[in-house]
Protein backbone atom coordinates (compact mmCIF):
# COMPACT_ATOMS: atom_id res chain seq x y z
CA UNK A 1 0.00 0.00 0.00
CA UNK A 2 1.29 3.44 -0.99
CA UNK A 3 1.18 6.33 1.50
CA UNK A 4 0.41 9.69 -0.12
CA UNK A 5 0.72 13.09 1.53
CA UNK A 6 -1.82 15.62 0.24
CA UNK A 7 -0.53 19.15 0.85
CA UNK A 8 -3.71 21.19 1.24
CA UNK A 9 -4.00 24.86 0.33
CA UNK A 10 -7.48 25.21 1.83
CA UNK A 11 -9.32 24.37 -1.36
CA UNK A 12 -12.66 22.62 -1.35
CA UNK A 13 -11.37 19.65 -3.34
CA UNK A 14 -8.47 18.52 -1.11
CA UNK A 15 -10.66 16.04 0.77
CA UNK A 16 -11.78 14.65 -2.60
CA UNK A 17 -8.13 14.10 -3.54
CA UNK A 18 -7.60 12.18 -0.30
CA UNK A 19 -10.74 10.09 -0.86
CA UNK A 20 -9.82 9.42 -4.51
CA UNK A 21 -6.52 7.91 -3.38
CA UNK A 22 -8.19 5.90 -0.61
CA UNK A 23 -10.87 4.67 -3.03
CA UNK A 24 -8.20 2.96 -5.15
CA UNK A 25 -6.82 1.16 -2.10
CA UNK A 26 -4.07 3.41 -0.80
CA UNK A 27 -3.47 5.56 2.25
CA UNK A 28 -3.60 9.37 2.17
CA UNK A 29 -3.18 12.12 4.74
CA UNK A 30 -3.94 15.84 4.52
CA UNK A 31 -1.41 18.43 5.72
CA UNK A 32 -1.84 22.22 5.56
CA UNK A 33 0.67 23.85 3.22
CA UNK A 34 1.88 26.29 5.90
CA UNK A 35 3.21 23.55 8.19
CA UNK A 36 6.78 22.30 7.79
CA UNK A 37 7.08 19.01 5.88
CA UNK A 38 6.82 15.85 7.97
CA UNK A 39 9.59 13.27 8.07
CA UNK A 40 10.35 12.27 4.49
CA UNK A 41 10.23 8.57 5.36
CA UNK A 42 6.55 8.70 6.36
CA UNK A 43 5.26 9.00 2.78
CA UNK A 44 5.95 7.48 -0.62
CA UNK A 45 4.80 10.48 -2.65
CA UNK A 46 3.15 13.90 -2.46
CA UNK A 47 0.19 15.71 -4.03
CA UNK A 48 -0.04 19.51 -4.01
CA UNK A 49 -3.80 20.18 -4.07
CA UNK A 50 -5.84 23.16 -5.17
CA UNK A 51 -6.87 26.21 -3.20
CA UNK A 52 -7.84 29.87 -3.14
CA UNK A 53 -4.33 31.39 -3.24
CA UNK A 54 -3.46 33.45 -6.31
CA UNK A 55 -0.20 32.82 -8.09
CA UNK A 56 2.20 34.53 -8.45
CA UNK A 57 0.86 37.16 -5.98
CA UNK A 58 0.87 34.69 -3.05
CA UNK A 59 4.05 32.85 -4.03
CA UNK A 60 5.95 34.04 -0.94
CA UNK A 61 3.48 32.03 1.17
CA UNK A 62 4.41 28.76 -0.57
CA UNK A 63 8.15 29.10 -1.31
CA UNK A 64 8.92 26.75 1.59
CA UNK A 65 7.28 23.91 -0.32
CA UNK A 66 10.49 23.54 -2.33
CA UNK A 67 11.55 21.29 0.58
CA UNK A 68 9.29 18.59 -0.91
CA UNK A 69 11.26 18.73 -4.17
CA UNK A 70 14.38 17.77 -2.25
CA UNK A 71 12.66 14.49 -1.35
CA UNK A 72 12.94 13.46 -5.03
CA UNK A 73 9.74 11.43 -4.57
CA UNK A 74 6.86 11.43 -7.05
CA UNK A 75 4.89 14.66 -6.78
CA UNK A 76 1.63 15.58 -8.51
CA UNK A 77 0.43 19.20 -8.57
CA UNK A 78 -3.29 19.75 -9.18
CA UNK A 79 -4.70 23.16 -10.22
CA UNK A 80 -3.05 25.61 -7.78
CA UNK A 81 -0.56 22.84 -6.92
CA UNK A 82 0.34 22.61 -10.62
CA UNK A 83 0.98 26.37 -10.69
CA UNK A 84 3.06 26.27 -7.49
CA UNK A 85 5.16 23.41 -8.88
CA UNK A 86 5.78 25.38 -12.09
CA UNK A 87 6.86 28.48 -10.14
CA UNK A 88 9.18 26.44 -7.90
CA UNK A 89 10.85 25.17 -11.08
CA UNK A 90 11.25 28.53 -12.82
CA UNK A 91 8.04 28.69 -14.85
CA UNK A 92 5.72 31.67 -15.24
CA UNK A 93 2.16 31.80 -13.88
CA UNK A 94 -0.33 34.60 -14.39
CA UNK A 95 -3.93 35.47 -15.20
CA UNK A 96 -5.57 33.20 -17.75
CA UNK A 97 -6.42 34.99 -20.99
CA UNK A 98 -9.57 32.81 -21.01
CA UNK A 99 -10.32 31.35 -17.55
CA UNK A 100 -11.90 27.91 -17.61
CA UNK A 101 -14.82 26.77 -15.46
CA UNK A 102 -16.76 23.57 -15.81
CA UNK A 103 -16.46 20.80 -18.35
CA UNK A 104 -13.50 21.14 -20.76
CA UNK A 105 -11.95 18.81 -23.34
CA UNK A 106 -8.30 18.01 -22.60
CA UNK A 107 -6.12 16.93 -25.53
CA UNK A 108 -3.26 14.58 -24.67
CA UNK A 109 -0.03 15.56 -26.46
CA UNK A 110 2.10 12.83 -24.88
CA UNK A 111 0.51 9.82 -23.23
CA UNK A 112 3.22 9.77 -20.58
CA UNK A 113 3.03 7.92 -17.26
CA UNK A 114 0.46 10.18 -15.61
CA UNK A 115 -1.86 10.37 -18.65
CA UNK A 116 -1.55 6.71 -19.68
CA UNK A 117 -4.92 5.46 -20.96
CA UNK A 118 -6.41 8.95 -21.47
CA UNK A 119 -5.40 9.71 -25.09
CA UNK A 120 -6.35 11.15 -27.46
CA UNK A 121 -8.67 13.34 -25.34
CA UNK A 122 -10.94 13.30 -22.30
CA UNK A 123 -13.41 15.56 -20.51
CA UNK A 124 -12.26 17.22 -17.27
CA UNK A 125 -13.50 19.67 -14.67
CA UNK A 126 -11.77 23.07 -14.60
CA UNK A 127 -11.90 25.96 -12.15
CA UNK A 128 -9.08 28.46 -12.63
CA UNK A 129 -8.39 32.16 -13.17
CA UNK A 130 -4.60 31.70 -13.38
CA UNK A 131 -2.53 29.26 -15.40
CA UNK A 132 1.03 28.33 -16.31
CA UNK A 133 1.87 30.81 -19.07
CA UNK A 134 5.43 29.58 -19.66
CA UNK A 135 6.52 26.11 -18.67
CA UNK A 136 9.76 25.67 -16.70
CA UNK A 137 12.87 24.88 -18.77
CA UNK A 138 13.12 21.42 -17.18
CA UNK A 139 9.61 20.36 -18.23
CA UNK A 140 7.48 19.33 -21.19
CA UNK A 141 3.83 20.12 -21.96
CA UNK A 142 1.96 16.81 -22.23
CA UNK A 143 -1.65 18.06 -22.52
CA UNK A 144 -3.56 21.19 -23.54
CA UNK A 145 -7.12 22.46 -23.99
CA UNK A 146 -8.64 24.93 -26.43
CA UNK A 147 -8.02 27.85 -24.04
CA UNK A 148 -5.09 26.63 -21.90
CA UNK A 149 -1.82 25.65 -23.58
CA UNK A 150 -0.36 24.03 -20.43
CA UNK A 151 -2.95 21.59 -19.04
CA UNK A 152 -0.32 19.07 -17.92
CA UNK A 153 3.44 19.08 -17.42
CA UNK A 154 6.08 16.42 -17.00
CA UNK A 155 9.31 17.48 -15.26
CA UNK A 156 12.78 16.14 -16.00
CA UNK A 157 14.49 17.17 -12.73
CA UNK A 158 12.44 14.69 -10.70
CA UNK A 159 9.40 12.43 -10.85
CA UNK A 160 7.05 15.43 -10.90
CA UNK A 161 3.85 16.12 -12.81
CA UNK A 162 1.34 18.94 -12.81
CA UNK A 163 -2.24 19.10 -14.11
CA UNK A 164 -4.42 22.20 -14.33
CA UNK A 165 -7.65 20.16 -14.36
CA UNK A 166 -9.28 18.40 -11.39
CA UNK A 167 -8.97 14.58 -11.62
CA UNK A 168 -10.55 14.24 -8.15
CA UNK A 169 -14.07 15.33 -9.14
CA UNK A 170 -16.62 12.95 -10.61
CA UNK A 171 -17.13 15.25 -13.61
CA UNK A 172 -13.63 14.37 -14.85
CA UNK A 173 -13.76 11.41 -17.19
CA UNK A 174 -11.34 8.71 -16.00
CA UNK A 175 -10.07 10.96 -13.20
CA UNK A 176 -9.35 7.94 -11.01
CA UNK A 177 -7.00 6.70 -13.74
CA UNK A 178 -4.78 9.76 -13.18
CA UNK A 179 -4.48 8.76 -9.50
CA UNK A 180 -3.90 5.09 -10.38
CA UNK A 181 -1.13 6.12 -12.78
CA UNK A 182 0.38 8.38 -10.11
CA UNK A 183 0.32 5.64 -7.48
CA UNK A 184 2.11 3.33 -9.94
CA UNK A 185 4.89 5.94 -10.13
CA UNK A 186 5.01 5.98 -6.33
CA UNK A 187 5.65 2.23 -6.28
CA UNK A 188 8.79 2.47 -8.45
From Swiss-Prot:
Self-association and partners: Heterodimer composed of a glutamine amidotransferase subunit (A) and a GMP-binding subunit (B).
HAMAP family: GMP_synthase_A (MF_01510)
Gene behind the chain: guaAA
EC number(s) from the headed UniProt entry: 6.3.5.2
UniProt keywords, alphabetically: ATP-binding, Glutamine amidotransferase, GMP biosynthesis, Ligase, Nucleotide-binding, Purine biosynthesis
Glutamine amidotransferase type-1 domain span: 3-188
InterPro entries noted in UniProt: Class_I_gatase-like (IPR029062), GATASE (IPR017926), GMP_synthase_A (IPR023686)
The protein's name in its UniProt record: GMP synthase [glutamine-hydrolyzing] subunit A
Any one GO molecular function term: GMP synthase activity
Active-site feature positions: 79 (nucleophile), 166, 168
CC terms in the record's Gene Ontology section: cytosol
Catalytic activity: XMP + L-glutamine + ATP + H2O = GMP + L-glutamate + AMP + diphosphate + 2 H(+)
Cited function: Catalyzes the synthesis of GMP from XMP.
Pathway terms, separated by semicolons: Purine metabolism; GMP biosynthesis; GMP from XMP (L-Gln route): step 1/1
EC class of the enzyme, as a word: ligase
